[in-house]
């Protein structure tokens, strides 16, 4: 479709976008029909290049700092205009999409991309509505210009690339970045800012529902098991990464999944395996000479990805919504090998561990990560994406848990028997058995043992799980060394938590250093 000097393709189909991507040399077809694209040096998010425009309407609500870096409004206007001018003679792809599968809490967004495969990604991950913007809300704009090169001296950026959110003007600018995950996380950050004002808790979590309508949430950083554990053949998927919890129910913020592919196997992750087909975008996945994806190959990055629409999953909740959750699971990947595979939390402990967000960066999704696996505290299990102060989200979580009576569990998908490099990681079947026990209600009123240093209640038995694994000290050959590591972890929790202004009940719910 002609539009001035350039050609603009409005709401193109999957087949058209795959065809354009191949013709333009943006990617290649794999043997399973997916489109594989490479992102170059930036194979993960670039947190140091992410900004929020500091303007009067939102300034007082945002927790400014290294995560939410301020950007000058005038500099934003200039850069937005330069990017628009740069794209004026380019072939472009445009779609009208939505973020939020809820009739009240959705945001309409027009996505303009320079690359066909980026548009395919957006149409896979955002929601393609039957009727666009039925409540006639103001429309957000995303512009993604990966070949535009930023000049820090001219543009006010930190490097040759940037991601900037402007809440007042409802604009998201992505320039100089090929990693498509920046698009989805930008709109997640937008909803993370907007939803709390509407009494809705935005969550970095996956969600599924059983045949009886019981909803389970899985919070966790990338690589801790959100996508894998929510893709359960016995349950129906709501979504794998971003949700809102409103009074009365849970809804997916997205319309697709962005699954990690490293070491993907049909045996361990059949739902994800089967979803990778024509229409799926594979990011930085290496193929063999017959175009068969080699999911074990991390030569480009550990952070290999598959982006596919929820329609690629047979067992899904078609309206992308569910009831309020009976069970809430905090997934932590403990590299110290100290935490038990499952703990049952009080609501005060839930608030403590939600604010702490203790876990590991596993095959980090951020560029510049020097170690494949390192421990971290990530507030709300997603610190890079939450613009408001952490307490806002923690208070909303407590409110939702109390009003509905949800039970919260801490599940360790990391190491046992010793730290990373000495112990071994819990295998997926063990964690699945624990999750099965959680969703069935088996762990609601069971006998527990209290781990004093960690201040956690651990069940003495879980169906399908070796009882020796449940109390972590049993898996360490050197019990004194375990006690030493447990004390170190408790001290790390206490030190990290000192920054939070909370009630004594919440502060005392943490480990005892």
From Swiss-Prot:
<keyword id="KW-0210">Decarboxylase</keyword>
<dbReference type="GO" id="GO:0006094">
    <property type="term" value="P:gluconeogenesis"/>
</dbReference>
<comment type="function">
    <text>Involved in the gluconeogenesis. Catalyzes the conversion of oxaloacetate (OAA) to phosphoenolpyruvate (PEP) through direct phosphoryl transfer between the nucleoside triphosphate and OAA.</text>
</comment>
<keyword id="KW-0312">Gluconeogenesis</keyword>
<dbReference type="GO" id="GO:0046872">
    <property type="term" value="F:metal ion binding"/>
</dbReference>
<protein>
    <recommendedName>
        <fullName>Phosphoenolpyruvate carboxykinase (ATP)</fullName>
        <ecNumber>4.1.1.49</ecNumber>
    </recommendedName>
</protein>
<keyword id="KW-0479">Metal-binding</keyword>
<comment type="similarity">
    <text>Belongs to the phosphoenolpyruvate carboxykinase (ATP) family.</text>
</comment>
<feature type="binding site">
    <location>
        <begin position="220"/>
        <end position="228"/>
    </location>
    <ligand>
        <name>ATP</name>
    </ligand>
</feature>
<keyword id="KW-0547">Nucleotide-binding</keyword>
<dbReference type="InterPro" id="IPR015994">
    <property type="entry name" value="PEPCK_ATP_CS"/>
</dbReference>
<feature type="binding site">
    <location>
        <position position="305"/>
    </location>
    <ligand>
        <name>substrate</name>
    </ligand>
</feature>
<feature type="binding site">
    <location>
        <position position="431"/>
    </location>
    <ligand>
        <name>ATP</name>
    </ligand>
</feature>
<feature type="binding site">
    <location>
        <position position="185"/>
    </location>
    <ligand>
        <name>Mn(2+)</name>
    </ligand>
</feature>
<feature type="binding site">
    <location>
        <position position="185"/>
    </location>
    <ligand>
        <name>substrate</name>
    </ligand>
</feature>
<keyword id="KW-0963">Cytoplasm</keyword>
<feature type="binding site">
    <location>
        <position position="241"/>
    </location>
    <ligand>
        <name>Mn(2+)</name>
    </ligand>
</feature>
<dbReference type="InterPro" id="IPR001272">
    <property type="entry name" value="PEP_carboxykinase_ATP"/>
</dbReference>
<feature type="binding site">
    <location>
        <position position="204"/>
    </location>
    <ligand>
        <name>Mn(2+)</name>
    </ligand>
</feature>
<dbReference type="Pfam" id="PF01293">
    <property type="entry name" value="PEPCK_ATP"/>
</dbReference>
<feature type="binding site">
    <location>
        <position position="269"/>
    </location>
    <ligand>
        <name>ATP</name>
    </ligand>
</feature>
<feature type="binding site">
    <location>
        <position position="204"/>
    </location>
    <ligand>
        <name>ATP</name>
    </ligand>
</feature>
<dbReference type="GO" id="GO:0005524">
    <property type="term" value="F:ATP binding"/>
</dbReference>
<comment type="subunit">
    <text>Monomer.</text>
</comment>
<keyword id="KW-0067">ATP-binding</keyword>
<dbReference type="InterPro" id="IPR008210">
    <property type="entry name" value="PEP_carboxykinase_N"/>
</dbReference>
<dbReference type="InterPro" id="IPR013035">
    <property type="entry name" value="PEP_carboxykinase_C"/>
</dbReference>
<dbReference type="GO" id="GO:0005829">
    <property type="term" value="C:cytosol"/>
</dbReference>
<comment type="pathway">
    <text>Carbohydrate biosynthesis; gluconeogenesis.</text>
</comment>
<feature type="binding site">
    <location>
        <position position="305"/>
    </location>
    <ligand>
        <name>ATP</name>
    </ligand>
</feature>
<feature type="binding site">
    <location>
        <position position="45"/>
    </location>
    <ligand>
        <name>substrate</name>
    </ligand>
</feature>
<keyword id="KW-0456">Lyase</keyword>
<keyword id="KW-0464">Manganese</keyword>
<feature type="binding site">
    <location>
        <position position="179"/>
    </location>
    <ligand>
        <name>substrate</name>
    </ligand>
</feature>
<dbReference type="GO" id="GO:0004612">
    <property type="term" value="F:phosphoenolpyruvate carboxykinase (ATP) activity"/>
</dbReference>
<feature type="binding site">
    <location>
        <position position="185"/>
    </location>
    <ligand>
        <name>ATP</name>
    </ligand>
</feature>
């Amino acid at each position: 479709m002609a539009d001035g000097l350039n050609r603009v393709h409005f709401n193109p189909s999957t087949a058209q976008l795959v065809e354009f991507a191949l013709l333009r040399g943006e990617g290649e077809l794999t043997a399973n029909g997916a489109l594989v694209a490479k992102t170059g040096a930036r194979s993960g998010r670039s947190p140091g290049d992410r900004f929020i425009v500091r303007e009067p309407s939102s300034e007082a609500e945002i927790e400014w700092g290294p995560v939410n870096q301020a950007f000058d409004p005038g500099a934003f206007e200039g850069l937005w205009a330069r990017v628009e001018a740069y794209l004026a003679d380019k072939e472009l792809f445009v779609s009208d999409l939505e973020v939020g599968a809820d009739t009240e809490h959705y945001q309409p967004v027009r996505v303009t991309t320079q690359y066909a495969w980026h548009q395919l990604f957006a149409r896979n991950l955002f929601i393609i509505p039957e009727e666009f913007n039925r409540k006639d809300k103001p429309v957000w704009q995303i512009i993604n210009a990966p070949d535009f090169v930023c000049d820090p001296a001219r543009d006010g950026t930190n490097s040759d690339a940037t991601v900037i959110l402007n809440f007042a003007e409802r604009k998201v600018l992505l320039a100089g970045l090929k990693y498509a995950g920046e698009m989805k996380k930008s709109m997640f950050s937008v909803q993370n800012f907007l939803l709390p004002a509407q009494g809705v808790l935005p969550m970095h979590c996956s969600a599924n529902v059983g045949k009886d309508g019981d909803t389970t949430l899985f919070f966790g950083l990338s690589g801790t098991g959100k996508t894998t554990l929510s893709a359960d053949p016995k349950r129906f998927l709501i979504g794998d990464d971003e949700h809102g919890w409103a009074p009365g129910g849970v809804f997916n913020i997205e319309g697709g999944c962005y699954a990690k592919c490293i070491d993907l196997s049909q045996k361990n992750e059949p739902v994800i395996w089967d979803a990778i087909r024509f229409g799926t975008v594979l990011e930085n996945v290496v193929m063999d000479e017959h175009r068969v994806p080699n999911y074990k190959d991390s030569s480009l990055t550990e952070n290999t990805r598959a982006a596919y629409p929820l329609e690629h999953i047979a067992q899904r909740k078609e309206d992308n919504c569910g009831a309020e959750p009976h069970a809430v699971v905090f997934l932590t990947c403990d590299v110290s090998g100290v935490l038990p595979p499952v703990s049952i939390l009080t609501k005060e402990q839930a608030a403590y561990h939600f604010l702490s967000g203790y876990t590991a960066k596993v095959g980090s999704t951020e560029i510049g990560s020097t170690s494949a696996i390192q421990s971290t505290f990530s507030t709300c299990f997603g610190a890079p994406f939450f613009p408001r102060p952490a307490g806002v989200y923690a208070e909303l979580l407590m409110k939702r848990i109390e009003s509905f009576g949800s039970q919260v569990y801490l599940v360790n998908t990391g190491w046992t028997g010793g730290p990373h490099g000495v112990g071994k990681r819990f295998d997926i079947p063990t964690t699945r058995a624990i999750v099965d026990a959680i969703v069935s209600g088996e762990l609601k009123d069971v006998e527990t043992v209290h781990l004093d240093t960690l201040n956690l209640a651990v069940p003495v038995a879980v169906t399908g799980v070796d009882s020796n694994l449940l109390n972590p000290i049993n898996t360490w050959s050197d019990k004194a060394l375990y006690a030493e590591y447990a004390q170190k972890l408790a001290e790390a929790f206490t030190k990290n938590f000192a920054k939070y202004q909370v009630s004594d009940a919440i502060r005392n719910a943490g480990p005892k250093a």
